[in-house]
Amino acid sequence: MLPNGLIVSCQALPDEPLHSSFIMSKMALAAYQGGAVGIRANTKEDILAIREEVSLPVIGIVKRDYEGSNVFITATSKEVDELIESGCEVIALDATTQTRPKESLEELVHYIREKAPHVEIMADISTVEEAINADHLNFDYIGTTLRGYTSYTKGHILFENDFEFLKEVLEKVNAKVIAEGNVITPEMYKKVSDLGVHCTVVGGAITRPKQITERFIEAVQQK
């Protein structure tokens, strides 16, 4: 089980300056030294490198685009197999209602339970309805990861209306809730922790210096 506390997402996509399994492993080490209780990472290669540096539990994903589908986070059994081979403790997958490239969400959950019963499963959702559905499918964790990132939640953001969406998810599901997506300040982290989430994933605000730099620049340029 993931412990309570801060999980740091250490990811860099191919078009980003820090794209490297070695760099992500050192980012994870820095997060561990700073007090993180877990890591979220993308690709089998990154996860294997990270596990060489830290013994923290890892939430694993594989981001891969499929034609005709907007689902790209651990979309099929192919990605699941890669994550099982990586040895990660938790597999996270897109649990939205968007068109899937291959297996149904229910089929993927069953596949993981059958093939790797020791691995926990996290649902990345964007609506309360998706959270309730994930709860019915017996996901171990439900994360607010994709709020604002699906076509039907575009324009929304996790912290709007004093985290109203997160509060509703917490109220409606029995699974452990993970706050993720635009938790961008220590104050926000404290707020969601006080609301009762099991743990919180913070990524860009800690591990993406390009984004952090842009935020500083934008603050000065705003009139």
Swiss-Prot record:
CDD domains: NanE (cd04729). The keyword Transferase does not apply. Pathway: Amino-sugar metabolism; N-acetylneuraminate degradation; D-fructose 6-phosphate from N-acetylneuraminate: step 3/5. SUPFAM superfamilies: Ribulose-phoshate binding barrel (SSF51366). It holds the Pfam family NanE. One of its GO terms (cellular component) is cytosol. GO terms for biological process: carbohydrate metabolic process; N-acetylmannosamine catabolic process; N-acetylneuraminate catabolic process. It catalyses: an N-acyl-D-glucosamine 6-phosphate = an N-acyl-D-mannosamine 6-phosphate. It is an enzyme of class 5 (isomerase). Keywords: Carbohydrate metabolism, Isomerase. It comes from the Bacteria. Its EC number is 5.1.3.9. One of its GO terms (molecular function) is N-acylglucosamine-6-phosphate 2-epimerase activity. InterPro entries: Aldolase_TIM, NanE, RibuloseP-bd_barrel. Converts N-acetylmannosamine-6-phosphate (ManNAc-6-P) to N-acetylglucosamine-6-phosphate (GlcNAc-6-P). Belongs to the NanE family. This is Putative N-acetylmannosamine-6-phosphate 2-epimerase. It comes from Staphylococcus haemolyticus (strain JCSC1435).
